């Protein structure tokens, strides 16, 4: 199908034409992603084994829950990439990026598999972690949230109606703002809490690179939303705004339940109330990025997660010379303020 027949990004079809390029920003994002290639073999987890032995029972419980979530979270993301996003975002430039993103999600899954093998030497513990969606209520609730908001578009073959396109937008926004942009941001906060105390350096190093990748994925998805808003502004009505706001509120509550599971009665420097404020701050940032008003007005309580309004992590990685890139050795040091 030629470009002249396809007027909008979500028009059904399979656009193949890269010249003239209709969406050069998506292509540039693909090229930027290539520069940030990393491999699991670059992550040294040896020192983490000794650190694990130093943790309190409460901290060990937190780590166990984190690796259980990591074991399943990126698989949900990868499935949605293949079954929904690649299918309906009709741009060869965007599909180049999505192909690259799928590779990155596979690297993340490999990293978490290596993490599980290192952190959980008992085969039964590993099996339980991979079955977390079935046997850990707080993780099951997060998975159910994802399926509730994302599955409605799965059986749609073509986005031919406004209602179908709004359902797709809800899927994309859930994927970007809630899973990549809230659930993973919450999980990474626990990792950096350990890192701020000089613990689990290997986990923190791998998380630096995963965090950067996830932020780039989120920003790409938001750019897709921006493009659809320009091409079809009528899709962004009051009802969609309310649905997105409700979605973010539900995501905060689901992630907060996970936080209660991880934190219990609280740990020094990490407790449920602080996590609530952090998640609300992140949710407000996501709503504002989508062009909707914030609802919480909370501030980030974690000095170790001072992200200048949460949304500027990508800029941080771009300006740090130690960020890993192809043919460049080094790690990201989060000890410095940013």
Residue ranges and their predicted role:
Residues 1-338:
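Non-heme di-metal
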